[in-house]
């Protein structure tokens, strides 16, 4: 049985990924602040299994313990492959550094960087000896490579995700049962995060007009299109180990 653990499944890209996997009779471990009832209905429709866990990714001091309880329920005997998709993220604060509050920085770092690091580490510890296909996909962003006015925290944490991914891949080189890991930048996706970006004051985000134009011109990628690309990463034999890739690369 294939297991896929996904964070941030209540809406947007995480929901689209979970939907496509459930249609393939995958067991999805859904982690978000609130349960997505539509995923539960879909699992019943396709005779799949969607197991929801409410987990506060900001609570980094208890995250390993809480995630360990979740992943410990999965036994190697029942697994043909196991994958982790660190999808949950936040772009806030969307304003120049001098305007942002310290608590906003802390929240951004906890959700975007520390949570993926802790979840990946716990995942690797639990599956260390498992002789199955193990993969981690960290959802990154082009902002991890390019600076944006008003996105100091987001750019910084996504750059951290990229480097973390590369470091883990380096550490897995000599392993007998290595974890495959990649950072994936999905492009500009038509989700609630993009709606939030378009509502930002222009003095706080100087690229605002570009993002509004992408929406008006129909150039945003659909969550379903991006989810398909991520699903392909879970299945391909030519896995881009340790790379930071953009969609369609």
From Swiss-Prot:
It comes from the Bacteria. Keywords: Cytoplasm, NADP, Oxidoreductase. It is found in: Cytoplasm. InterPro entries: Biopterin_syn/organic_redct (IPR051721), NAD(P)-bd_dom_sf (IPR036291), Sc_DH/Rdtase_CS (IPR020904), SDR_fam (IPR002347). One of its GO terms (biological process) is tetrahydrobiopterin biosynthetic process. The keyword Oxidoreductase applies. NADP(+) binds at residues 6, 87, 154, 158, 189, 191. It catalyses: (S)-benzoin + NADP(+) = benzil + NADPH + H(+); 2-hydroxy-1-phenyl-1-propanone + NADP(+) = 1-phenyl-1,2-propanedione + NADPH + H(+). Transmembrane segments: none annotated. Its EC number is 1.1.1.320. The keyword tRNA processing does not apply. CDD domains: SPR-like_SDR_c. Inhibited by Cibacron blue 3GA, a general SDR family inhibitor. One of its GO terms (molecular function) is sepiapterin reductase (NADP+) activity. The active site is at residue 154. Belongs to the short-chain dehydrogenases/reductases (SDR) family. Reduces benzil stereospecifically to (S)-benzoin. Can also reduce 1-phenyl-1,2-propanedione, 1,4-naphthoquinone, 1-(4-methyl-phenyl)-2-phenyl-ethane-1,2-dione, 1-(4-fluoro-phenyl)-2-phenyl-ethane-1,2-dione, methyl benzoylformate and p-nitrobenzaldehyde in decreasing order. This is Benzil reductase ((S)-benzoin forming). It comes from Bacillus cereus. The lineage of its organism: Bacteria, Bacillati, Bacillota, Bacilli, Bacillales.
């Amino acid at each position: 049985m294939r297991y896929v653990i996904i964070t941030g499944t209540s809406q947007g890209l995480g929901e689209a990924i979970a939907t496509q996997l459930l249609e393939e009779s995958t067991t999805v471990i859904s982690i978000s602040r609130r349960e997505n009832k539509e995923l539960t209905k879909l699992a019943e429709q396709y005779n799949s299994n969607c197991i929801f866990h409410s987990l506060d990714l900001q609570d980094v001091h208890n995250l390993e313990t809480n995630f360990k309880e979740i992943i410990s329920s999965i036994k190697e005997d029942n697994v043909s492959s196991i994958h982790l998709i660190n999808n949950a993220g936040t772009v806030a604060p969307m304003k120049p550094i001098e305007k942002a509050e310290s608590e906003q920085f802390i929240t951004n770092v906890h959700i975007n960087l520390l949570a993926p690091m802790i979840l990946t580490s716990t995942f690797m510890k639990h599956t260390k000896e498992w002789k199955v296909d193990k993969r981690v996909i960290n959802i990154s962003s082009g902002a991890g490579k390019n600076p944006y006015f008003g996105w100091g925290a987001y750019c910084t944490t996504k750059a951290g995700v990229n480097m973390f991914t590369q470091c883990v891949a380096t550490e897995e080189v000599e392993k007998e049962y290595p974890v495959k890991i990649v950072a994936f930048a999905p492009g500009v996706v038509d989700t609630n995060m993009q709606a939030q970006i378009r509502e930002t004051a222009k003095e706080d985000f100087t690229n605002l007009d570009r993002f509004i134009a992408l929406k008006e011109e129909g150039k945003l990628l659909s969550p379903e299109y991006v989810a398909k690309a991520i699903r392909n990463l879970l299945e391909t034999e030519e896995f881009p180990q340790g790379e930071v890739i953009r969609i369609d690369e």
